[in-house]
Amino acid sequence: MRGVFLDKDKIPYDLVTKKLNEWYTSIKNDQVEQAEIIKTEVEKELLNMEENQDALLYYQLLEFRHEIMLSYMKSKEIEDLNNAYETIKEIEKQGQLTGMLEYYFYFFKGMYEFRRKELISAISAYRIAESKLSEVEDEIEKAEFFFKVSYVYYYMKQTYFSMNYANRALKIFREYEEYAVQTVRCQFIVAGNLIDSLEYERALEQFLKSLEISKESNIEHLIAMSHMNIGICYDELKEYKKASQHLILALEIFEKSKHSFLTKTLFTLTYVEAKQQNYNVALIYFRKGRFIADKSDDKEYSAKFKILEGLFFSDGETQLIKNAFSYLASRKMFADVENFSIEVADYFHEQGNLMLSNEYYRMSIEARRKIKKGEIIDENQPDSIGSSDFK
């Protein structure tokens, strides 16, 4: 006898599956280095694993999920993500995915579509994944799903749905001390929704708590995200100096890791400095942020930087602003349209340009109407992701 190795020393697939689960845990915790190490170990074991189709399919799905993680944590090219998606899409078309594997496909597809800012496609994929949650026994996996859905709804400014899913995730994560990281991420969503509800002081309190937990956990990207969110909150409170201080702290960390939130931080910092009329400083951040957005083919932030260019760094080229809003609207990013159109309207009002000011105020009202219409549509669809009972 030679222990557990059977079939001419082939590695039992259940041992490889255990290693795959460890890999997935590292991915969910955004532990890039650990995930890379385990991925390499898994790939070596697969070469000598006893035949098992489900284990191979699970590997391919996790490889896709791994690429999604890298696209956030290391600003990896979206093209790499597209290639990984095409591979698993072909597998799904062949009808090889059932049970948990099918759940993972739609769950990861939702993340992929959200990364591409295909918001409706993301919600559609999550809706199918939710219909298969009965296949999921692990409470932590359910909480992870609730968190991801809450993030999309937060992005779409669907506050009711976002808060409900975030709270469902929090209820589970708080029961496990080892999931402090996930708890912090959920708190980000709750606090972001408080900002959307104009409850800035409560949001700031949440973000400051998140910063404290992130520092205790010594997780740099969460520390940076906390500083970024605190900066955004101070921006809303019109405490621009404090906003700049926290955004700069976030920037220092994101620049080292090349995190995907680097562009967002540079954009916000540009805007905050411009609001303080520190145009020379703002221009430095603007050039850096626009360069990164263009280089990484980040169409969302390329458009947003055009808004700032039209307002502060051009000779009154208002067409830049119109083009940017056209792009955001075409992607159904109505929350961004509403927020920025109000800011632009206020700017033109201060400049005495009442015609443009009124145009953008009207745009904000129309965007708000579309956001509200989206909530009504979801509530009336029985198979909607937002129509389940919240407890």
From Swiss-Prot:
The UniProt record lists the keyword Iron: no
GO cellular component, one term: cytoplasm
Chief localisation class: cytoplasm
Induction: Expression is stimulated by conditions of low nutrient availability and high cell density.
Residue windows of the TPR repeats: 62-95, 150-183, 184-217, 224-257, 275-311, 338-371
SS bond list: none
Cellular compartments annotated: Cytoplasm
GO molecular function, one term: phosphoprotein phosphatase activity
Activity regulation annotation text: Inhibited by PhrI.
PROSITE patterns hit by this protein: TPR_REGION
Pfam families, sorted: RapH_N, TPR_12
Signal peptide start and end residues: none
Miscellaneous field: Encoded by the mobile genetic element ICEBs1.
Stated role: Activates ICEBs1 gene expression, excision and transfer by inactivating the ICEBs1 repressor protein ImmR. RapI-mediated induction likely results from an increase in the specific activity of the protease ImmA, which mediates proteolysis of ImmR. In addition, is involved in regulation of sporulation. Acts as a phosphatase that specifically dephosphorylates the sporulation initiation phosphotransferase Spo0F and inhibits its activity.
Name recorded for this polypeptide: Response regulator aspartate phosphatase I
Species the sequence originates in: Bacillus subtilis (strain 168)
Taxonomy of the source species: Bacteria, Bacillati, Bacillota, Bacilli, Bacillales
